[in-house]
Amino acid sequence: MSPENDRVPTAIRPARPGAASSHEKLTPTARRASVAGFVGTIVEYYDFATYGLVAVILAPQFFGTENSAAAVLAALAVFGTAYVARPLGGMVFGHLGDRYGRRTILVTTIASMGFCSALIGVLPTLDQVGLVAPVLLILLRLGQGFAAGGELMGAVAYVLESTPNGRRGILTSITQMGATLGFSIAALVVGSVTAVTTSEQMSAWGWRVPFLLCLPLTLVCLALRLRLEDSPEFADMVANSEVKRAPLLDAVRQYPGAIVKAAAFTIATTAASHVGLVYMSVLLIKTLGFDSQSVYWTTALVVAVAALSTPVWGTISDRVGRRPVMIVATVGTAAVVYPVLWAMSSTSSIVVVGMAFLVYMIFTQAFAPGLTAVSELFPRRVRYSGSALGYNAGIVVGGAFAPYMSAQLVESTGSALSPALLIVAVCAIGLAAAISIRETGKAALRK
């Protein structure tokens, strides 16, 4: 029997000795881990969201002005290239994180992401250096993606391993809330720059400002992470000589089913969230004709409010389990996406657009406990490797090209409602994964 199937049923699995109850006070280690994970995911998704938000403005600077629709599609395709590099980054950093510790790798990933983003802010344009400009942009996006491949699931693993049983859902959801807030901050920054510049200034140099601001955000996160110790679970692994020489290979050989389920649920998670976080701004500005400044401000507000629901979903998952919340996320998102897109395309009121967008985003936040469950599927010796591999394999399909595919659907059908077909399809995949996954919410963290 494989290690993946050779497990004690959840209902009778004993808690590990000394495991804290859900009522035990959080330790300083757990609090520091949660804050560091939260700030790190803010930086990660600020970096990624900034590109998506300025894609419409950036497109002619790197891909020409002869065909504006083609330039936007090219810019969104470059957005997807960063995700293509994520699986390799997940494999490399996951392997290193299981061998040498979570903290060291999390410092490396956030530094790499931040510096790549800042360099985008100083790139020459197509008019200045010709085809070298889009090539450099693609290389930096690949660098971002490679580093990001080791970031989120490493942060989730670190927080899980520093948190008492019964509190893992709430604290890891706070880490994941940082992803949504990172996007909101990016929208706020882009909206602010748009407000104080003319359209000509924004096209000439204003788009660079949000990328350059990645640098101070990265330095703050580095200061926090450099003060951390490694997770108690990893320290215990070292003390008991449990660190494996090839954790990535062990994960693939011993837990293939868990990796596939992780990838399947991630397809739904990332496609649903990225259509909301990245493509909606393109749809509202380019297709539906809303003012860009209004869209950025509305997006920032809606996403910030929706982010507040993330810890609520995490708390619910600690009480009722991960699977019920995962099912609500997939079914709820699929159910509301068509009405939301219809409401957006049938009104000229940015307030109505914002309210519809908020409904959609609240349901997408319910996916957060699913990523916690993904990490909980693996024992600590391969947790970073296995979860990062599964997550990043899924994100290539779900996150990389969901905005691009949405734009193509609208372009080919002429209907602003057509991206709903994509979301319903990926949510069906996520629902199948949620139903098949074992419940981990109330079980002790696997050793």
Where are these regions (language model features)?
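A late C-terminal transmembrane helix in Major Facilitator Superfamily
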Residues: 381-412
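Multi-pass alpha-helical transporter architecture, strongest
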Residues: 221-228, 425-447
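C-terminal ends and interior cores of transmembrane alpha-helices
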Residues: 111-129, 331-346
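Central cavity-lining transmembrane alpha-helices of secondary-active solute carriers
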Residues: 76-95, 114-116, 300-313
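Glycine-rich segments within core transmembrane alpha-helices of 12-TM secondary carriers
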Residues: 170-194, 217, 390-402
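Cytoplasmic membrane-interface "Motif A"-like loop-to-helix N-cap segments
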Residues: 99-111, 319-330
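C-terminal transmembrane helical hairpin of 12-TM major facilitator-type secondary transporters
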Residues: 323-369
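Extracytoplasmic gate region of multi-pass secondary transporters
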Residues: 52, 256-305, 399-402
